[in-house]
Structures are given as C-alpha cells and as structure tokens.
Amino acid sequence: MNAITETVDLQAPPPVPLVFTDSAAAKVKDLLAEEGNPELKLRVFVQGGGCSGFQYGFTFDEVVNEDDTVLDKEGVQLLVDPMSFQYLVGAEIDYKEDLEGAQFVIRNPNATTTCGCGSSFSV
C-alpha cells in the first residue's frame, strides 16, 4: 500500500497596506463631480503638528509623483507620498456621516495615542 502525503501551505494573505473604503471613494467621486475636474485625485498626507505630534491632511492634487502609492477605487485615485505612507501602513481611510457630522476618518493601527478630534496622533 502506498501512502501519498501532500503538504499544503496555509498562510494568511499578506496584510493590505492601506484600505480605501467604498464610502470614502464614493464621497471623493461626489466631490470631484462638484469640482468639475476629472484629473483631480485625493491626496492623504501626514505632517508634524496637532496636539499629539502628527496630523492627517487631505487635499486634491492633479499630479501623481513617481514615488506615490496610488490606490484606485470606484474610478477615483487616492495618493500617498512615501513619508506619509510609512505612518499609514495598515490604516483605513473611510468617510462617515452620523450625528456628529460628516467627515473623512483614518483608522490607524500605528497610532499609539490620538487626540479627541481624531485628526492628530503619535506613534
């Protein structure tokens, strides 16, 4: 009797470096339609400042730099520069509407502390 042994490597898929939610992409699409410029992309960045040391920023940009990380979703593009990307690995960029208002939200697993408003953090 012959026994056949097969080894199957069951590794988890690699972590997604950055999540751009459907809700955020849909809101960006709406904002781009209002602007009337199909060349615009949403740029997310991290800069020094805020009450916790770093703060998030959002802006529209027509230029995609060679070293930008580009995420495509729902026909819109999210851009992140390399310096900001290192602080955003594993983060989720979302858009929420609730009783507190409507805003883009970044859920960042790298942030060790955040301020009350959620726009600044430390690592």
Curated annotation (Swiss-Prot):
Transmembrane regions listed in the UniProt entry: none
Q: What residues bind iron-sulfur cluster, as annotated?
A: C51, C115, C117
One GO term under biological process is: iron-sulfur cluster assembly
* Keywords (A to Z) from UniProt: Iron, Iron-sulfur, Metal-binding
Which cofactors does the annotated protein need, by name? iron-sulfur cluster
Q: Which Pfam family, giving just one, matches this sequence?
A: Fe-S_biosyn
Cofactor binding comment, as recorded: Binds 1 iron-sulfur cluster per subunit.
Q: InterPro entries recorded for this chain?
A: FeS_biogenesis (IPR000361), FeS_cluster_insertion (IPR016092), FeS_cluster_insertion_CS (IPR017870), FeS_cluster_insertion_RrpA (IPR023063), HesB-like_dom_sf (IPR035903)
Q: In the record, what terms sit under GO molecular function?
A: 2 iron, 2 sulfur cluster binding; 4 iron, 4 sulfur cluster binding; iron ion binding
This molecule's function is given as: Required for insertion of 4Fe-4S clusters.
Name the HAMAP family on file: Fe_S_insert_ErpA
Quaternary structure, per UniProt, is: Homodimer.
Family affiliation = Belongs to the HesB/IscA family.
Name of this protein: Putative iron-sulfur cluster insertion protein ErpA
